[in-house]
């Protein structure tokens, strides 16, 4: 089939298109030589949110006497601002209204979060039987129709379970998966997952999932035709934390090629899944590339004629900034260099041990390439949440990464007996904190609690979460 939309496209022109549409300030948009202001995402907390979170924290920790409390009373806990999740959904709908979000349940499977997202019209990306069952258990009307089983390599029993629950949309990237679907779920709608260039992403997925165009066209489509399966469209994922958004352009371009092949073979593809990996801080750039590529390769005329819809699988975009983790300092060990707080000295004065770490809710440090910022919550029986947040906002708003305020340097360690359980090799705190004080970590809603373990028997189970809503009047 002749692909007239991309045939003989000069590489220089392509690069100029990309530069023109994406390598510009997030605060401006240039169209036909005219520059206008575009949406800027505000990822800072409002004063109302800060006050609500501080009050919630204060009410909880004021009941805890770390010297006399019962075991686990002083455990780490989360505060979740549901208003921040509402803001995330609103921003998505304002900037990418043509793309229906399917929240990646694996990112944070908190039932309250899932319910809130459902009420806001968000659907769900599930990767296992348990995730499917969790969404189905929430009492959402026609929940099975709002799930994509987005795992290209599935257990046979899970496929049968999806069929039993009428979850009828999934992804594949190999012929062997087609045989399983033909046997256990023959009426399931299939998206072929393409491999992408995610070399600039912090969390790369193409080393594990996705097929190239040749495999999709030469192997998967013919076999799906032979087996009588419903090929419903294309899926891809460019990885999380990407900085080069040209990979989105290329993936959508490849998707159009595959759509054309599907149409030429008699399939009726209706869905393009552009995956996840979106972050609020870079959403103006990534979303702009999505819109540009969709306009170029899936123009309105083509999409309307073939009734094509677009979906995505955002996870961290929706929940990362909504969660604050509060941890307790359970031990301190002063080092021989203690007391030297010269700002040029990069040696910690003491080691702090907290009751959460990389085997718990801070596993994102190891497995998600995150470096969560730590702040002082209490010291000498005083609460510093608002003060710390206001200082942080001031630094961010002034675009000043060189905080000249004197501080105390510590290394911070989790509670397990593993030397790998290091939260921070060097953290600069505003106070000389002691055993019994509390610390807090901001923006830890994504890939944290969902991957915590019970290593060393130090976890008492699900971490307590307190809820506020800064979006309420």
Swiss-Prot record:
Pfam (any one): Orn_Arg_deC_N
Record comment: activity regulation: Inhibited by antizyme (AZ) OAZ1 in response to polyamine levels. AZ inhibits the assembly of the functional homodimer by binding to ODC monomers and targeting them for ubiquitin-independent proteolytic destruction by the 26S proteasome.
Stored PANTHER family: ARGININE/DIAMINOPIMELATE/ORNITHINE DECARBOXYLASE, ORNITHINE DECARBOXYLASE 1-RELATED
Broad EC category: lyase
Reaction(s) catalysed by this chain's protein: L-ornithine + H(+) = putrescine + CO2
Gene Ontology cellular-component terms listed: cytoplasm
Subcellular location: Cytoplasm
Taxonomy of the source species: Eukaryota, Fungi, Dikarya, Ascomycota, Saccharomycotina
Family assignment from sequence similarity: Belongs to the Orn/Lys/Arg decarboxylase class-II family.
Statement: the UniProt record of this protein carries the keyword Transit peptide: no
Pathway the protein acts in: Amine and polyamine biosynthesis; putrescine biosynthesis via L-ornithine pathway; putrescine from L-ornithine: step 1/1
Organism domain of life: Eukaryota
Names of the cofactor(s): pyridoxal 5'-phosphate
Positions annotated to bind pyridoxal 5'-phosphate: 240, 277, 313-316, 447
Subunit text: Homodimer. Only the dimer is catalytically active, as the active sites are constructed of residues from both monomers.
UniProt keyword annotations, A-Z: Cytoplasm, Decarboxylase, Lyase, Polyamine biosynthesis, Pyridoxal phosphate
Residue numbers of N6-(pyridoxal phosphate)lysine PTMs: 106
Binding residues annotated for substrate, in chain numbering: 367-368, 418
UniProt-listed InterPro entries: Ala_racemase/Decarboxylase_C (IPR009006), De-COase2_C (IPR022643), De-COase2_CS (IPR022657), De-COase2_N (IPR022644), De-COase2_pyr-phos_BS (IPR022653), Orn/DAP/Arg_de-COase (IPR000183), Orn_de-COase (IPR002433), PLP-binding_barrel (IPR029066)
CDD domains according to UniProt: PLPDE_III_ODC (cd00622)
Source species: Candida albicans (strain SC5314 / ATCC MYA-2876) (Yeast)
Protein name, per record: Ornithine decarboxylase
GO biological processes: pantothenate biosynthetic process; polyamine biosynthetic process; putrescine biosynthetic process from arginine, via ornithine
Annotated site location: Stacks against the aromatic ring of pyridoxal phosphate and stabilizes reaction intermediates: 237
GO molecular function: ornithine decarboxylase activity
Role description: Catalyzes the first and rate-limiting step of polyamine biosynthesis that converts ornithine into putrescine, which is the precursor for the polyamines, spermidine and spermine. Polyamines are essential for cell proliferation and are implicated in cellular processes, ranging from DNA replication to apoptosis.
Catalytic activity, EC: 4.1.1.17
Active site: 417
